[in-house]
UniProtKB/Swiss-Prot annotation:
May be involved in the intracellular transport of sterols or other lipids. May bind cholesterol or other sterols. Disulfide bonds: none annotated. It comes from the Eukaryota. One of its GO terms (biological process) is cholesterol import. One of its GO terms (molecular function) is cholesterol binding. Expressed in most tissues, with highest levels in liver and in kidney. Residues 1-213 form the START domain. The keyword Cell wall biogenesis/degradation does not apply. This is StAR-related lipid transfer protein 5.
């Protein structure tokens, strides 16, 4: 993959995801509980929804980030049941790569195993926020794989934000807009994302405690 194209494309995605973070309009709450709020609005990228999750975790932004950062043999595979494997297909810079993520079947096997090939950019902001920003790409080393339906992540990502006044806590804001493809009933998709995003937060909290405390 051409590094200059990848750099340009990933920066455009990061701008878009930052815009989602700053734009408070049009979100409809669909799930709330245990300090986690999930909301959605129609996606501008595909005929589906953009989902937003927000919750406060015990742990510094670095500790939270360590459990979710996109690296080969990272912690994410160890604790996240929604990720069966994660590999780096091409490392472009320290902060930019192409990854392939495999996910197991879900929703009582209504959703069969998926794989996703993404361009992923990590950004660090002056206030201490660490973000990941991703979108789907095609890559010659990632042809369709038997046994997996290829899904497509439209611009998505997360922000590990320092909590003012409490250096040991992190405000985690996540954005998903994923085309699972493969002829799924819309009702299955609409119920799956809010639920899996809501479960992600307590599972991540357990991982932060396990690996960092």
């Amino acid at each position: 993959m051409d590094p200059s194209w990848a750099t340009q494309e990933s920066e455009a995605v990061a701008e878009k995801v930052l815009r989602y973070r700053r734009d408070a309009s049009g979100w409809k709450k669909c799930r709330e509980g245990n300090g986690v709020s999930i909301s959605w609005r129609p996606s501008e990228e595909f005929p589906g929804n953009l989902y937003r999750g927000e919750g406060i975790l015990c742990g510094t932004p670095e500790e939270v980030w360590d459990c979710i950062k996109p690296v080969a043999s990272g912690l994410r595979e160890k604790w996240d049941d929604n990720v069966s494997s994660f590999e780096i297909v091409q490392s472009i810079t320290d902060m930019l790569c192409v990854s392939r993520t495999s996910t197991p079947s879900a929703a009582m096997k209504l959703i069969s195993p998926r794989d996703f090939v993404d361009l992923v950019l990590v950004k660090k902001y002056e206030d201490g926020t660490i973000s990941s920003n991703a979108t789907h790409v095609e890559h010659p080393l990632c042809p369709p794989k038997p046994g997996f339906v290829r899904g497509f992540n439209h611009p998505c990502g997360c922000f590990c934000e320092p909590l003012p006044g409490d250096p040991n806590k992190t405000n985690l804001v996540t954005f998903f807009q994923t085309d699972l493809s493969g002829y799924l009933p819309q009702s299955v998709v609409d119920s799956f994302f809010p639920r899996s995003m809501a479960e992600f937060y307590p599972n991540l909290q357990k991982a932060v405690r396990k690996f960092h405390h």
